[in-house]
């Protein structure tokens, strides 16, 4: 359903889920990006996927390391593991995407800039070519300001999770209004290279899902009809 309207995807994993994801690659030539979600990634799966899909271009870094219920890593912990991630990417000819950052819950690291600055200082030879961000602010203006904070790194931005989500009061209409304001900005700002709406399929998120019960949701219909928006 989404295949004609997207150019890439990921699934927070090291490889595709054949029963769910394979058709996107085979039928629509969509670019899949494996991820090292935390330090406990399956290197063999990544190597096998890239061997079978030489068109693979990127390796995504740790998922929200400054959130305690996600990768939950201090800059020091992430930096200690990063040389192995870089070596893997180098051997496979993949471009490295930074750990994906949002405002966090890890003590001392609510500020994603603080986390990233410390991480980069610890691993200056990090090979990062793209900065990944997550943003759940309620308005497109706040999202734009958040992205602008990371312009100083001089690298393309991938917004790999975004939607308006404050824990209460969400509605289909608020998701559509936000999307209608956010996507034109994301498409036009040359700083933003790729983006991925949260969430494509219904996993207990009734308002923001693009697909529900095997058909496009109302939000999904807006997304599909806006996407010449194909980043």
Language model features with spans:
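Active-site clefts of carbohydrate-active enzymes
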Residues: 34, 97-108, 152-181, 198-213
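Aromatic-rich peripheral "rim/lid" segments of glycoside hydrolase catalytic domains that contact
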Residues: 23-34, 38, 169, 185-231
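Active-site groove signature of glycoside hydrolases
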Residues: 53-75, 95-106, 126-135, 159, ...
């Amino acid at each position: 359903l989404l295949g004609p309207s997207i150019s890439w995807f990921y699934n927070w994993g090291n490889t595709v889920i054949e029963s769910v994801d394979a058709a996107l690659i085979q039928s629509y030539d969509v670019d899949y990006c494996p991820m090292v979600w935390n330090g406990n990634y399956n290197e063999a799966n990544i190597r096998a996927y890239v061997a079978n899909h030489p068109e693979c271009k990127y390796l995504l870094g740790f998922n929200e390391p400054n959130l305690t219920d996600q990768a939950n890593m201090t800059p020091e912990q992430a930096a200690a593991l990063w040389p192995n991630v870089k070596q893997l990417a180098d051997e496979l000819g993949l471009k490295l995407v930074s750990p994906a950052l949002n405002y966090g819950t890890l003590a001392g690291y609510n500020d994603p800039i603080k986390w990233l600055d410390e991480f980069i200082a610890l691993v200056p030879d990090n090979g990062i070519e793209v900065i990944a961000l997550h943003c759940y602010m309620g308005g497109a203006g706040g999202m734009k300001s958040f992205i602008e904070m990371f312009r100083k790194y001089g690298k393309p931005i991938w917004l790999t999770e975004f939607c308006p989500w404050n824990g209460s009061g969400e509605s289909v209409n608020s998701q559509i209004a936000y999307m209608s304001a956010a996507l034109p900005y994301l498409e036009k700002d040359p700083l933003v290279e790729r983006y991925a709406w949260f969430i494509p399929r219904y996993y207990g998120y009734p308002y923001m899902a693009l697909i529900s019960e095997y058909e496009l949701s109302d939000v999904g219909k807006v997304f599909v009809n806006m996407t010449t928006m194909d980043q």
